[in-house]
C-alpha cells in the first residue's frame, strides 16, 4: 500500500491512538487531532474537488 491515501492516514492515526494509550502523552493527542483535521480536509477535497 503506497502512495498515501485514506487507508494510510487511518493506519497512521490508529498508531498514534495506540501511542496515546500506552504513553499517555497529551501532546500526541494534539498532534492526532491536527493530523485528523488535515486528513478530513484532504478527503473532502478528493470527494468534492476545489469548490
Curated annotation (Swiss-Prot):
The keyword Magnesium applies. One of its GO terms (cellular component) is chlorosome envelope. Its main location: other. Gene3D superfamilies: bacteriochlorophyll c-binding protein. A bacteriochlorophyll e binds at residue 25. The lineage of its organism: Bacteria, Pseudomonadati, Chlorobiota, Chlorobiia, Chlorobiales. Pfam families: Bac_chlorC. It is found in: Chlorosome, Chlorosome envelope. This is Bacteriochlorophyll e-binding protein. The keyword S-adenosyl-L-methionine does not apply.
Amino acid at each position: 500500500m503506497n502512495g498515501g491515501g485514506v487507508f494510510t492516514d487511518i493506519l497512521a492515526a490508529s498508531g498514534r491512538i495506540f501511542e496515546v494509550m500506552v504513553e499517555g502523552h497529551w501532546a500526541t493527542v494534539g498532534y492526532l487531532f491536527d493530523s485528523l483535521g488535515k486528513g478530513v480536509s484532504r478527503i473532502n477535497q478528493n470527494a468534492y474537488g476545489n469548490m
